[in-house]
Curated annotation (Swiss-Prot):
PANTHER family: 3-DEOXY-MANNO-OCTULOSONATE CYTIDYLYLTRANSFERASE, 3-DEOXY-MANNO-OCTULOSONATE CYTIDYLYLTRANSFERASE, MITOCHONDRIAL
Cited CDD domains: CMP-KDO-Synthetase (cd02517)
Species classification: Bacteria, Pseudomonadati, Pseudomonadota, Gammaproteobacteria, Alteromonadales
GO cellular component, one term: cytosol
Location (main, coarse): cytoplasm
Entry-linked NCBIfam families: kdsB, PRK05450.1-3, PRK05450.1-5, PRK13368.1
Described function: Activates KDO (a required 8-carbon sugar) for incorporation into bacterial lipopolysaccharide in Gram-negative bacteria.
GO molecular function: 3-deoxy-manno-octulosonate cytidylyltransferase activity
Localization in the cell: Cytoplasm
Source organism of this protein record: Alteromonas mediterranea (strain DSM 17117 / CIP 110805 / LMG 28347 / Deep ecotype)
One GO term of the biological process aspect: lipopolysaccharide biosynthetic process
Gene behind this protein: kdsB
Enzyme Commission designation: 2.7.7.38
Keywords for this protein: Cytoplasm, Lipopolysaccharide biosynthesis, Nucleotidyltransferase, Transferase
Protein's UniProt name: 3-deoxy-manno-octulosonate cytidylyltransferase
Family from the record: Belongs to the KdsB family.
Length: 248
């Protein structure tokens, strides 16, 4: 099975400007992401950016596609890459964020393989068990519900499912075994990406501020499975990176 990895990378960030170029062991963060994609066995790896500073650095180790500054999401940026690079419609494209230097290569391969094995689904993504009660109630931790077919039913910043009897009797408590956190990695077939970006934004997507709800709103299916490897801690600030580097 072959697949392409597209890595959207933005320079601008209110909490961590220039994050994709931050150095880790002497290499920019984005280079580590490219290396993880290579380890996963991607046939092609493309960094998609609208910033020349990122372009100038990445050209030394990977293919770069310059994209419009007007995109509102990484998926829109990927759609432009698919169009300008003439990627065939049946190609599996994996969206790996440019600020995930320690993403396990196994997870990249897993999400691509899952989509290849689920022809009834338009997308695939991953989740991981929630072990902290605080995370259940944290709106920055997106929860996902999956049916018996391994298809996502809903994504929410709220605690879903809501275990009525227990949680009403025990406010601010939760049975963590019921909850899974969504991991922000996606696989799609290239022709579906072009379809997706032509959908009008959905009401639920705007309410929750979760773009994957657009697919569910329009009746498309998202395969979801627990990741084979634990996901790394997110890097949102320079302090996050410093703490992470202290642990490796």
């Amino acid at each position: 099975m072959s697949f392409t990895v597209v890595i959207p990378a933005r320079f601008g960030s209110s909490r961590f400007p220039g994050k994709p170029l931050a150095l880790i062991d002497g290499k920019p963060m984005i280079q580590h992401v490219v290396e993880r994609a290579k380890e996963a066995g991607a046939e092609s790896i493309i960094v998609a950016t609208d910033d020349e500073r990122i372009q100038n650095v990445v050209e030394g180790f990977a293919q770069v596609c310059m994209t419009s500054v007007d995109h509102q999401s990484g998926t829109e940026r990927i759609a432009e890459v698919i169009q300008t690079q003439n990627i065939s419609g049946d190609t599996i494209v994996v969206n790996v964020q440019g600020d995930e230097p320690f993403i396990p290569a196994e997870n990249i391969k897993q999400v691509a393989t899952n989509l290849a094995n689920a022809p009834q689904c338009q997308m695939a993504t991953l989740s991981t068990p929630i072990v902290s009660v605080a995370d259940v109630f944290n709106p920055n931790i997106v929860k996902v519900l999956v049916n018996e077919k391994g298809e996502s039913i809903y994504f929410s910043r709220s605690p879903i499912p809501f275990e009525r009897d227990y949680m009403m009797a025990n406010p601010n408590k939760a049975n963590t075994a019921l909850y899974n956190r969504h991991i922000g990695i996606y696989a799609y077939r290239a022709d579906y990406v072009n379809q997706y970006v032509n959908y009008a934004p959905s009401a639920l997507e705007q309410i929750e501020s979760l773009e994957q709800l657009r697919a569910i709103w329009y009746g498309d299916k998202i395969h979801c499975e627990v990741a084979v490897a634990p996901p790394p801690v997110g890097i949102d600030t320079p302090e996050d990176l410093e703490r992470l580097l202290e642990t490796i």
